Amino acid sequence: MFGWAITFLVIAIAAGIFGFAGLAGTAAWIAKVLFVVGLAAVLIMLVMGRRPPTV
């Protein structure tokens, strides 16, 4: 998930350099969304992994 976010961030930067404003904005938005979703998934996995063992 973070790999995809970095990929779209690089696409956004490259598009911004070459002047494709619409594409840069869209790619940056996708990168932000994927980063937040990935971060939420990591936090959920950290919380779920700390359950006490059931006897």
Swiss-Prot record:
Pfam family, one: DUF1328
Cellular compartments annotated: Cell membrane
Coiled coil: none
Membrane topology field: Multi-pass membrane protein
A GO cellular-component term linked to this record: plasma membrane
Disulfide bonds: none
InterPro entries (UniProt xref): DUF1328
Keyword terms: Cell membrane, Membrane, Transmembrane, Transmembrane helix
Residues passing through the membrane, by range: 1-21, 28-48
Domain of life, source organism: Bacteria
NCBIfam families for the chain: PRK13682.1-4
Annotated HAMAP family: UPF0391
Family to which this protein belongs: Belongs to the UPF0391 family.
Protein name: UPF0391 membrane protein Tbd_2772
Protein's organism: Thiobacillus denitrificans (strain ATCC 25259 / T1)
